[in-house]
Amino acid sequence: MKILHIANFGFNKQGAHFYCTDRKISAGLVENGHFVYDFSFRDMARMGTIFKTKKLGASWANKEILKIVNNLEPDLVLIGHSDLMSPEVLKQIKQQYPETKIAFWYVDPLYLEHKLDFIRAFSPY
């Protein structure tokens, strides 16, 4: 299975995020025979602007996701902690590739309303 895993891999942390959940999930999927393309949303958003800020580069990172999906044609898009990702991107993915499944993982507590709002925005997809 081809999987696009969109999460916060912390590529700019020089190995400090070696044991983070997103890396463990990707490693487990690879060990089970899947091809996994890791997309570090926050790092890519920072690269998308001269000011190196996530918020200003989020639009660019969202466009990059669509380019990757067009090249990779994944069977599964797995999303974790990509709080600046646009739900519109998922809508476009489902329109272009209706067979592609979209899954979401989250490890933060759900008693905070802004966390629930984020999850609700993605739930239709």
Where would I find each of the regions flagged by the language model?
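Extended catalytic core of nucleotide-activated donor transferases of GT-like folds
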Residues: 15, 20-28, 32, 37-125
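Nucleotide-activated donor-dependent transferases that construct or modify glycoconjugates
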Residues: 1-15
